């Protein structure tokens, strides 16, 4: 897991204000790991993962802003980007314990997480741990459970 720089652009702050605002639509989701009961989070899908279809599909009217911010982050860090399979915002309330590891996709990929606040909750990828601060950005290989 590697922490990269967040350019903190005007578009980033616009996206952050949108996602953390009162009017942003969140949808209740249960644990992605069906072996655990009681774990939940809220989600807003911008670009749906290509699980049941060979291509991802747009699910949010706000995708262009999210896409711009992701491109800015990659360009600022001089990182190549070939394709985006999924774009999603998650909000996870504090809960007892940790959720079991899960795999986001069954094919080779990389994950990018942008932390819009510092509400707590560590990210575990294999043996690595990130204790996020507001506006942190991390990237890691999708071959690991997270």
What residue ranges belong to the model's regions?
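Non-heme Fe(II)/2-oxoglutarate
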Residues: 1-82, 92
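Catalytic core of non-heme Fe(II) oxygenases with the double-stranded beta-helix
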Residues: 52-146
